[in-house]
Amino acid sequence: MIRKLTRGSIIAIAAVMLLLPFYKAHAGIPVGTWRAHPAYNDATFSLKAFGMTAVLSDGAIYLYDPSDNGLYTIDKTGGLGDTDIAAMGYCNSEQAVILVYSNGNIDLLYNDFTIYNFTDIKNNGTGSVSVNELKVIADKAYISTNIGLIVFDVKRREISNTYRFDTQVYSSVVFNDTIICSTDSGMYLGLDSDNLLDKNKWKKFSDIRFRTLFEFDGQLAGNSFINRIWTIDRNTAALKEKIKDDVTGLSLQTDGRLVLIQDTAVTFYNSLSDFTAYIFPSHVNDVMTDGDDVWACQGNYGLCRYSITNDGLVLKARMIKPDSPRRNWFHSVSWPQPGRLLAVGGCHNYQNINYPGTVMIYENDRWTSLDEDIPSKTGVNYQNLTEAVQDPSDPDHIFVGSTGQGLYEFRNGKFSKLHTWNNSGLSSILNDTEFNKNNYVRISALQYDKEGNLWMANNETDTILKVMQPDGKWFGLYYSEIAGLPTFKQLRFDDKGRIWINSSRYNPGLVCIDLNGTLKKNSDDKIKFSGPYFVNQDGTTEEISQLTFYDVDMNGEMWIGTNRGLFILKDPDSFIDDANPVFERVKISRNDGSGLADYLLNGVYVTAMYIDQGNRKWIGTLDQGIFLLSADGTSTLEHFTTSNSPLPSDNILSITENGQDGSLFFGTSLGMVEYGGQARDPEESLSESNILVYPNPVKPDFDGYVTITGLTEFSSIRIMSNSGHLVHMGTSNGGSYSWNLTDMNGRQVPSGIYHAIITNQENNKSESTSITVIR
């Protein structure tokens, strides 16, 4: 069972979990609340704490209680101060798990499950902090970073000292009365009794660098950057190679033993001359011993439990990990059918960074991923995926584009075929070598049309638009206006059958193509490309370098996201024939008496967009989190960032909504979170049988929104007291409405029975429902 911890005691979990099934049955998660979806698929480190095993996996933490096989997760929604844990340790004297994040932020998780957040290192004002190592000695945490060695006093919850070396500190160790640091420029030692804040007190005694320093068997030792173990004479700096084989990991156990890991081989040392080795069934990242039990972190196999017997190593349990996404990367997300989220973790490889091929499905509260055992079958790397699309006639048939290897086809979750330059209508950018032919077939912007044809962009080739027909045959459509352009991110059909695509960089712009009713004949087609210069309603010309996203709202207006902010194409129907289309900017009055206004989100790099059932705009940005805008954009209703919400990152990659329950899913560079939104798919007609209110009754300890679902679009809601007074009124967001239990003056309403009168947009039908409030 997975249980989510809060800042309060563990007893509070039962109450929280009792509530969740009620909300789940009706609304996903409550309006205004959050649920994190971190990956727990690469277990790398574990330690014993509070009678449980704490596991670090994909930069997140979970705990396993062997007494009842309970799994406990904790994240930003449950009180952690940050995301992406770089190192974890345990302070026995303070009964605290120490979590050091990749940005230097620190959380102390105590045995009563309270959390103390320490931000001084993160907010040090000297630039970004990256963490290389954490060692806990007594009540001190020694944190090796890119800015030096930081000593954190766990008991006093403060920084004791910061020793700066003007270079990376990879590892540190306290050996007798000396602190020894391995840095990018060699090893330094300093007497603990000296004023080590004075750099001159540190003595450089070797040019050799070590990834990890440690003390064992009365000797100073280190794991070098070529993964060999050496002993180090601290006086002469003489090195003796002790273990030549490739050491991929090591740990010092609480019982004093040293554990060295070499892929699947794990050796337990009582001393450097007294050891026992075991072979594990798969790669091991870390090992923790507890009597005769051995807890191994084995990557995708999660936490595994073994016993040491006279017959050797015996597996007792494996795959001890919470259900979670495969990875923390959500480049593209969509809902191809009700109840199914389809996510792709990849990129367009702008920075020449290769992301493992990742396609994930979230359905029925479970995460699964598509087959990844592909390179052995294709001979090319499976990486940098761009977008996935589900066959509208077969939910088990999925196509996925990639930045270099072509179009992947999956059936029933298993890899079926790679469509590439030599077996399809697709083309490679480079044709000089076999390697280049196989690795420069760039496919993105996948979309099915009503006839079941699969459209896509074959980037940076002469013929950009390629189409695979239902019978597997291919054809291409050539347009000189877009030939050779490198990056198309979206391809969509409007209600008139026109194609809209966006060239996102290097001559970015908006493209509209009218096929004129002839699918394969492009001589009678009309095409319009506009960019990279946009002219706004003031006649001002603005140059964009990125056109990242577009979407059409309920008023038929196209909202366009760029590196300069938002633009609006008021009449998309006239765009293709308009010689000088106007891309309007929303203006926000300064309200300072000057009569001046500023452009909405001017200069803000927009990366993602979603228009919900209330016609509100959810805007994702490169480094400023998420904005929720009113339907016309003139009001900012919410602004979520990492500092005021559980967002794991302010770099937003994707946004989508589960229209059934109104939950928003935000994909970021550090993982996904879900937010209980106020809008959902509307009903076609207003009917008492569809209307549902929850929670109802409202209990005294409830602090949230009452949600009314089953409404038609733009229904009006009037909430009346039992005596007939108007208490509250509003308009539905799609098929739902959320009430914060306040009256027209913003005051909390008292106990009583309230009546919601709901009228459809046409004002020809009304229904009512009751809400009981108990204070």
What are these regions (language model features)?
Residues I374, N422, N733-G734, T772:
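A generic structural motif
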Residues S393, D449, D494, G710-T712, ...:
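Surface-exposed coil/turn segments at beta-strand junctions on protein surfaces, enriched
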Residues S716-V727, G746, Y754:
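Short, glycine-anchored, charge-dense loop/turn motifs used at functional sites
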